């Protein structure tokens, strides 16, 4: 029996629906990400995606569940002195995805994956800056953020890595702008990094898996065979891939995007004209179809 689960969407409008998986599942997302990763956007779609990205830089993305780092100061320079690539590590909270099978990694702790990667690329400690997640000083449901804070603090101090603490009012976007490589474990800061043309590595699964603007290292073997930061796609390809992903997350994955409109994170209005057969077909076929399947052209 096919079933549908639903949740509020990442960026606000529409309804997030999954077929035959719970709301944390990645199968439906990955399929749509991959399907549209190489497809051109129309000018309208590109403008809509660009406007959504701009909101994150301006701190006006109020329809997302949480807005972090608003009004924080930008450091005048990179926090360390290095002549090699500046590596920014931006761990996510992972409080929402803990123990879900689609988000599992082969390493016991996220810092174990980071150790493997930093060793594989021969990173020096002066290359690395770690930006602690703001909600590590908060409790989210049964997830106590301080455990992550304690883990990363000890890891940074043991390895001599510079870190920006959770409570510090330092702009994460400013750090991204000054880095050469951004390493994440599924966090949405990949959007800002992609919009700035940065080299992005995701250590493990994420909502943007299936896209090409980010390099995914999800196994020990993939880290061992990683060739470093030189063999990379161009900045233009990163820009294009980021725009395509954002549009997919904004208006393809959510269902009824034009008819369920967010006023705040918890209040929505429903407009007339939505076609209920879309929901019926999802139940019949067991597949999520893009709410907007239109694509642009090269001209």
Where are these regions (language model features)?
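P-loop NTPase catalytic cores that bind/hydrolyze ATP
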Residues: 1, 87-95, 269-270, 274
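Active-site and donor-binding regions of nucleotide-sugar-utilizing enzymes
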Residues: 1-39
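A donor-sugar binding/catalytic signature common to diverse glycosyltransferases
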Residues: 1-3, 7-9, 14, 167-215
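General small-molecule cofactor/ligand-binding pocket signal
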Residues: 4, 129, 162-164
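Short secondary-structure boundary/capping segments
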Residues: 13, 18-24, 102-106, 144-147, ...
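Leloir-type glycosyltransferase catalytic cores
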Residues: 25-74, 212-299
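Conserved catalytic-core segment of nucleotide-activated headgroup transferases in glycan assembly
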Residues: 56-152
């Amino acid at each position: 029996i096919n079933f549908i689960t639903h949740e509020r969407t990442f960026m606000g409008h529409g309804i997030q629906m999954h077929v035959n998986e719970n709301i944390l599942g990645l199968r439906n997302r990955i399929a749509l990400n991959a399907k549209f990763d190489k497809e051109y956007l129309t000018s309208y779609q590109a403008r809509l995606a660009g406007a959504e990205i701009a909101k994150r830089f301006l701190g006006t993305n109020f329809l997302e569940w949480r807005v972090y780092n608003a009004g924080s100061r930008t450091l005048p320079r990179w926090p360390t002195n290095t002549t090699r690539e500046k590596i920014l590590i931006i761990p996510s909270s992972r409080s929402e995805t803990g123990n879900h099978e689609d988000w599992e990694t082969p390493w016991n702790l996220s810092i174990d994956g980071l150790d493997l990667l930093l060793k594989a690329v021969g990173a020096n400690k002066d290359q690395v800056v770690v930006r602690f997640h703001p909600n590590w000083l908060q409790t989210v449901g049964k997830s106590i953020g301080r455990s992550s804070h304690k883990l990363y603090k000890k890891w940074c101090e043991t390895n001599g890595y510079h870190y920006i603490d959770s409570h510090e009012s330092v702009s994460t976007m400013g750090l991204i702008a000054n880095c050469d490589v951004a390493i994440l474990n599924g966090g949405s800061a990949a959007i800002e990094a992609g919009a700035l043309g940065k080299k992005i590595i995701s250590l493990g699964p994420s909502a943007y898996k299936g896209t090409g603007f980010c390099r995914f290292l999800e196994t020990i073997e993939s880290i061992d065979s990683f060739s470093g930061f030189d063999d990379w796609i161009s900045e233009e390809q990163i820009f294009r891939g980021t725009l395509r992903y954002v549009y997919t997350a904004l208006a393809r994955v959510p269902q009824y995007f034009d008819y369920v409109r967010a006023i705040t994170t918890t209040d929505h209005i429903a407009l007339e004209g939505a076609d209920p057969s879309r929901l019926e077909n999802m139940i019949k076929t067991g597949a999520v179809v893009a709410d907007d399947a239109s694509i642009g052209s090269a001209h």
